[in-house]
Each structure stands twice: as structure tokens, then as C-alpha cells.
Amino acid sequence: MELKSFQIEASEQIAERYESYMNDPLYIRKNEIVPFYQNLSAITGAGKTLVLADAIEQIRAMTTTQPVVLWLSKGKVVVGQTFENLSNGKYADNIPSYAIKPLLD
């Protein structure tokens, strides 16, 4: 699915924040970094799922390891829709070769 210009700008900003953070991360211990955290809020229908899917692809291109993404939402309906859209729905092509799993798996 194609992103709109404001969505591209948002996904690039998230990926750039990740890259910047990984260049100078916070540490829990000497060899244990605090994971990168990004919160995204926007009105319903703004394309948050698409923005984050695109950001994940950009982040994957920056790393030598497969990123692990914990995707949280307050609403059960939103969680179900997001799971479907990312695993085999309209956004699945935006994050190819990812294993999409519910948290309990």
C-alpha cells in the first residue's frame, strides 16, 4: 500500500530516531542497552499501522539483526485489526518476511 507524504515523513522520522538512538543508546548495564521505544498517536484513519510498518522496514534495512517489535494498543478491536492487516491483510506486503504473532505466542 502506498504511503501519503505525511506518512512517509512520519515513518522516516521514526527510523531516524532509531538510528540516532542506536548510535548512542542508554545502558541498563555495561553490555545491556535499554530497548528503543517509540510511541505514535494519531486520529483514527490516519494510517498509524502503515506508518509503523514502513518504519519497521526502514529499521530492518539499518540493522544486521531482525528487529523485534512489540506493538501495543488499548483497544481489542484495534489489536485484532492490526494483527490481521499485518499478517495477511492490506499491510502484509509492507512488511514482507516477518513473523507476526500475538503476544501470548
What are these regions (language model features)?
Residues 1-105:
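RecA-like P-loop NTPase motor core of helicase/translocase proteins
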